[in-house]
Amino acid sequence: MNEYLLLLISTVLVNNFVLVKFLGLCPFMGVSSKLESAIGMSMATTFVLTLASILSYLVNQYLLLPFDLSYLRTMSFILVIAVVVQFTEMVVQKTSAALHRALGIYLPLITTNCAVLGVALLNVNEKHDFIQSAIFGFGAALGFSLVLILFSAMRERLAAADVPLPFKGGAIAMITAGLMSLAFMGFTGLVK
């Protein structure tokens, strides 16, 4: 139990996929201008990352490894991710049309979010079992969501602030992301 808790904490805080591994930067910068869309994207990405992590583990263990098809790992994981994203898009469209419109193109772009594929591939490389894969995927999703929501809240405050003209827009966003990354470096010694 303690091992699973450490894996979750390390994935969320210490080895955050956005701020430490620099994966998932496209939605991080693209959807973070409004808090409402960032929360929706966080929920969708959490669902996709967790489910894709679990399904990728199952595909790898029960299809690719027994038939010695490990060379198809990346392609099969992309296929799994695409199916999960399409399922998520259908669910979001049926349950909340406003959220579907707010997320726009970023919802189908979860398919190309390198963090989702990165989690699936890292599960294999780190030889996680089923429960560890689920926790790793969920932790990565929580870390992504935490950073996206915090960053979105800061960007909304910066939009109303008196920022010097050369720093408006993307420049101040990059500076803020860098400062967030430095803040998350403080968690480095938390988990070994």
UniProtKB/Swiss-Prot annotation:
InterPro entries tied to this protein = Ion_transpt_RnfA/RsxA, NqrDE/RnfAE, NqrDE/RnfAE_oxidrdctase
Under the heading Pfam families, the entry gives:
Rnf-Nqr
> Which keywords does the record carry?
Cell inner membrane, Cell membrane, Electron transport, Membrane, Translocase, Transmembrane, Transmembrane helix, Transport
The role this protein plays is: Part of a membrane-bound complex that couples electron transfer with translocation of ions across the membrane.
Recorded topology in the membrane = Multi-pass membrane protein
E.C. designation(s): 7.-.-.-
Name the record gives this protein: Ion-translocating oxidoreductase complex subunit A
Query: How does this protein assemble?
Result: The complex is composed of six subunits: RnfA, RnfB, RnfC, RnfD, RnfE and RnfG.
Q: Where does the record say this protein resides?
A: Cell inner membrane
Family label:
Belongs to the NqrDE/RnfAE family.
Q: Give the highest taxon in the source lineage.
A: Bacteria
The membrane-spanning stretches of this chain are: 5-25, 39-59, 65-85, 102-122, 134-154, 171-191
Q: What is the lineage of its organism?
A: Bacteria, Pseudomonadati, Pseudomonadota, Gammaproteobacteria, Alteromonadales
Among the GO biological process terms of this entry, one is: electron transport chain
Predominant localisation class? membrane
A single GO cellular-component term from the record reads: plasma membrane
